[in-house]
Swiss-Prot record:
Coiled coil: none annotated. This is Cysteine--tRNA ligase. It is found in: Cytoplasm. It is an enzyme of class 6 (ligase). Gene3D superfamilies: HUPs. Binds 1 zinc ion per subunit. The gene is cysS. Its EC number is 6.1.1.16. Belongs to the class-I aminoacyl-tRNA synthetase family. ATP binds at residue 253. One of its GO terms (biological process) is cysteinyl-tRNA aminoacylation.
Length: 406
């Protein structure tokens, strides 16, 4: 990830959130866990983060699931929105600056669509949906690196081009809203673009995040709408995380091959998945296996021990080394950053390593020795000086148990 941060201290950032009709799986957390760590690294460098995250609480999948369960869409989405917030807390992910539900901003989204219509970027298809005409955007394809000619196969049944997308879907199925375009609801691509346009006051984002699977058509269509209204790209920088596979297969609910985030947390320390996600360069696919989880479980135990040993040897941290490692994480060079961490471990630079872990927001950094326990370290030091190693080991073992249970 390369970000142009010259002359910037306040960063406007957006990440597409979950469609809340079911529990999130562990792969859904890759981008937001990485963001959580990188944002802390940026704050360490003096940056201010203005982070918008949306909750898609109206969608065909939501309507179908609510009807299947015999409950309202609002009941369903409230349940899974709250479940998502619990997951953020369990995995030690800071809540974004602002979280907004799509249904809270329907009027703003309608106003946004009106602007696109007024500027002549829309038409009605044969279903009477209001559609965005990509032929009106000369640089359509710039985000996904595609030539517009390859995207313009005709689809005369409904739209001028197969890639024209719905801004307002005319429907009375499930939850719908009143607008000048008829009864219906907004299209997904428009929801995100409108929220960004409104919250960030028409400005381009400094960073837009998401998974690699969203490059086309979602990110492309968001950008097309923003460009149509402002003449500028929707984001100056993009961050996209790679796929998380499970035992060699794509992790997807449709394939019945998922590991729910809540189930992961019941079985494993949540720091393990943070360690996995921060050890592999962001765009590289991850194959989640029992062996990989086991390896990072051992690594987390090693990291915990380092934070414990810091109490016994609080030498000054090497600020330049901390900055070097954090900069590598900001640049998305996770493998190189982890190599340097391993070098620091060999050198027993515990203060420096602990500072890095604090910035990466590992939950184990909250483990503490209380003042009374720290006083016992003085006794330990005296016993070491007196070469009474067996008694010193007993104190150390006692303190380790206190630390682990803190």
């Amino acid at each position: 990830m390369t970000m142009n941060l010259i002359n910037k201290k306040n960063l406007n950032i957006y990440l597409c959130g979950p469609t809340v009709y079911s529990d999130v799986h562990i792969g859904n957390l890759r981008t937001i866990i990485i963001f959580d760590a990188i944002f802390e690294c940026l704050k360490n460098k003096g940056f201010s983060i203005n982070f918008l995250h949306n909750i898609t609480d109206i969608d065909d999948k939501i309507i179908e699931k609510a009807q299947e369960l015999g409950i309202s869409e609002a009941e369903l989405t409230e349940k899974y929105t709250n479940e998502y917030f619990k997951i953020l807390e369990i995995f030690n992910i800071k809540k974004p600056t602002k979280i907004v539900k799509v249904t809270e901003k329907i009027e703003k989204i309608i106003e946004y669509i009106k602007l696109l219509e007024k500027k002549g970027f829309t038409y009605y298809n044969k279903n009477n949906d209001l559609v965005f005409d990509i032929l009106k955007i000369p640089n359509y394809g710039i985000i996904s690196g595609q030539k517009i000619e390859s995207l313009l196969d005709k689809n005369t049944k409904k739209t001028k081009s197969k890639n024209d997308f719905v801004l307002w879907k005319k429907t009375q199925k499930g939850l719908f809203f009143k607008s000048l375009f008829g009864l219906g609801r907004p299209g997904w691509h428009t929801e995100c673009a409108a929220l960004i346009y409104d919250y960030f006051q028409k400005k381009s984002l400094d960073l837009h995040g998401g998974g690699v699977d969203l490059i086309f058509p979602h990110h492309e269509n968001e950008n097309a709408q923003h460009f149509a209204l402002t003449g500028n790209p929707i984001a100056e920088n993009w961050f996209r995380s790679g796929f998380v596979n499970l035992n060699g297969k794509k992790m997807a609910k449709s394939l019945n091959n998922v590991l729910l985030a809540k189930n992961f947390s019941h079985k494993y320390n949540p720091d393990i998945i943070r360690s996995i996600f921060l050890s592999i360069n962001p765009t590289v696919p991850i194959n989640l296996t029992e062996e990989l989880i086991k390896n990072h479980k051992k690594l987390i135990e090693k990291y915990q021990k380092i934070c414990f040993e810091w109490y016994f040897d609080k030498k000054n941290e090497k600020t330049e080394k901390v900055e070097q490692v954090l900069n590598l994480f900001i640049e998305g060079k996770f493998a190189k950053a982890n190599f340097l961490i391993m070098e620091l471990i060999k050198q027993k630079e515990n203060s420096t390593i602990r500072k890095i872990f604090l910035n990466l927001r590992f939950n184990f950094t909250k483990m503490r020795l209380d003042p009374e326990s720290q006083e016992k370290i003085k006794n330990w030091n005296k016993l070491i000086m007196d070469k009474n190693y067996s008694e010193a080991d007993k104190i150390r073992e006692e303190l380790w148990k206190i630390f682990k249970n803190s």
